[in-house]
């Protein structure tokens, strides 16, 4: 089973039904729900997601959505090493650097899924948009 790290932008697309991106993100979460892939999210994403999602709903509704998300995915820790690696990196976006190092430190992550691939140009992990991941996954599954 492939382990995929899901960036917060993809999760926001899914949870807010943000068009035109929500279709691909919903398919990825369907694959996770069907246990065809394993989804991973950093612990940092939860606070970022709460902040963004709170603009769309009540505290209670957002917490409920995040609880459901926590049941679907593995939550990867952000610790001292993660932050120090991010601070020492050449990433232009600090939040993305923390996401990247959280994914990289989890040795079983096979790829990172984001719509923001330009910020991960120096990644040692494969970085794909949701659309590219789905095409790759379908091609691999059918062969």
Predicted regions mapped to residue ranges:
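Active-site-proximal, substrate-binding regions of enzyme catalytic domains
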Residues: 26, 44-48, 52-82
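Active-site neighborhoods of divalent-metal-dependent phosphate/nucleic-acid chemistry enzymes
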Residues: 74-117
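Short acidic-hydrophobic, aromatic-tinged amphipathic segments that line or gate anion-handling sites
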Residues: 76-78, 127-130
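Short, well-structured N-terminal submotif of metal-dependent ribonuclease cores
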Residues: 1-40, 54-61, 122, 128, ...
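Short, structured coil segments at secondary-structure junctions
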Residues: 71, 123-124
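Hydrophobic side chains within alpha-helical segments
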Residues: 10-12, 16, 51, 96-102
